[in-house]
């Protein structure tokens, strides 16, 4: 998959979306959204976010409702992402794998800033000076 699309045609976007849907376990492309399970709807929304050309990608718990193979695919996809990634997740190791900087924020205060390995060694909720 071409992660940064540029001037893709509608056909290429549809092909990319179908490839992503298949990787995320959705293979019936004609099934109405209303008939999808909650997890399938979340995965479909993830595909919509990933296929759209963007400079910033915002994801909320992207590995929820994904099995191990799907998470691995998403991890590889995000490693190739050429834009900024803002993600809310409890999976720090996934986060460390797909980002080069992590900022931990709680109640409007920055508590950690760095890479996951450093943040895990930092006492929880110790404010950082940046």
Language-model features: locations:
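ABC ATP-binding cassette signature C-motif
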Residues: 1-129
């Amino acid at each position: 998959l071409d992660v940064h699309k540029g001037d893709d045609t509608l056909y290429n976007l549809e092909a990319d979306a179908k490839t992503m849907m298949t990787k995320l376990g959705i293979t019936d492309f004609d099934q109405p959204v209303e008939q999808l399970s909650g997890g399938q709807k979340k995965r479909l929304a993830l595909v919509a976010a990933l296929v759209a050309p963007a400079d910033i990608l915002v994801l909320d718990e992207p590995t929820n409702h994904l099995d191990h193979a799907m998470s691995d695919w998403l991890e590889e996809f995000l490693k190739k992402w050429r834009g900024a990634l803002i993600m809310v997740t409890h999976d720090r190791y996934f986060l460390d794998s797909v980002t080069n900087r992590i900022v931990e924020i709680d109640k409007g205060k920055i508590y950690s800033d760095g890479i996951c390995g450093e943040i895990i060694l930092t006492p929880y909720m110790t404010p950082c000076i940046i």
